[in-house]
Amino acid sequence: MTTLGTPLSHHATKVMLLGSGELGKEVIIALQRLGVETIAVDRYNHAPGQQVAHHTRTITMSDPALLKALIQAEKPDLVVPEIEAIATPMLEVLEATGVVRVIPTARAARLTMDREGIRRLAAETLGLPTSPYQFCDSFEELQAAIEGGIGYPCIVKPVMSSSGKGQSKISGPADVQKAWDYAMAGGRVSHGRVIVEGFIDFDYEITLLTVRAKGADGQIETHFCEPVGHLQVNGDYVESWQPHPMHPAALERARHIAKTVTDDLGIAVDGQASGLGIFGVELFVKGEQVWFSEVSPRPHDTGLVTLTTQWQSEFELHARAILGLPVNTALRNPGASAVIYGGVDAKGIVFDGVDEALRVPGTDLRLFGKPESFVKRRMGVALAAHADVEQARVNAKLAASKVKPRAA
């Protein structure tokens, strides 16, 4: 039996989110609906999740001393990482010494904080199919890797980055220097390390939202949402839709890959397979073939579409799973999402055209409330529900196009 407390009381169930962007904001809302006291942590003030949480804290989460002091002071029941740039070795120490439980596990947070940890786990430890790859610490190593077997075309990404930052496609020798320089500018750390991947000629890519949750007998079960199709431009999601049709054999392989990697990431530092929550498993598909790409041990940006498609969104699934509650991954109706970009570099943004956007049939909006806009910063998302998923895509993109952010 799961017992939950009352917020702002001595018996509250307290959850701390490390990273409070648009995904964290929705997780916080889902937790609050279940009576959980929430603490939103981010590197800057007034982050989206901080706008709705019971408590807010602003620190450099990659600083182990600051992170340890904050967790010891707040004493949350659960710590939920929402981003990669966190002092994950400290989380492992705190989890191992019983100070706090990390979702899904501190080990998963460490392994997925950069592309190297998770790629080596998937390909070298678990033997999952991936694109050919090599890690490089210099421009010369990158050149040698490409010429020595990776070949053209190929994809270069910083080992630590997100939302496509620093990622580019290399079509020939003339592109290598530009790609290296772009990767160095887009990575999260100052030292230069990249992954170069051989290009897979895939038909489409999906996110398979995979949930580890407790069943009625207390044992951990794996649940799958319907496949989420998505379109990425330079590694950054611009639209997603659900369900994406798949050949039954490809879907079976996708689920096998997703379960294999999430089972492993569910193993805590003590060796127990205790990790709970949702994972966004990204996969390439060609016919009946499936390749592992990446995994996030948390809600996924492409999964924003589930706000309009599922009985329980990915955020509600995450909240329920980590609290030990039952989950329902069933589809309610087909739908789609389309990103609303900032379009301008400015602090203090207003949005024109919201009324026009919501006149598109079956649509809804989420405006994230980010205090500063950049031209390519994700400031909101349009959602559309329709019995025909292709029409939902049209409607979502139309609604998104009506919203015009501008400086106040």
Curated annotation (Swiss-Prot):
It catalyses: N(1)-(5-phospho-beta-D-ribosyl)glycinamide + formate + ATP = N(2)-formyl-N(1)-(5-phospho-beta-D-ribosyl)glycinamide + ADP + phosphate + H(+). Pathway: Purine metabolism; IMP biosynthesis via de novo pathway; N(2)-formyl-N(1)-(5-phospho-D-ribosyl)glycinamide from N(1)-(5-phospho-D-ribosyl)glycinamide (formate route): step 1/1. GO terms for cellular component: cytosol. Residues 120-323 form the ATP-grasp domain. It is an enzyme of class 6 (ligase). Pfam families: ATP-grasp, PurT_C, RS_preATP-grasp-like. Homodimer. PANTHER family: FORMATE-DEPENDENT PHOSPHORIBOSYLGLYCINAMIDE FORMYLTRANSFERASE. This is Formate-dependent phosphoribosylglycinamide formyltransferase. It comes from Albidiferax ferrireducens (strain ATCC BAA-621 / DSM 15236 / T118).
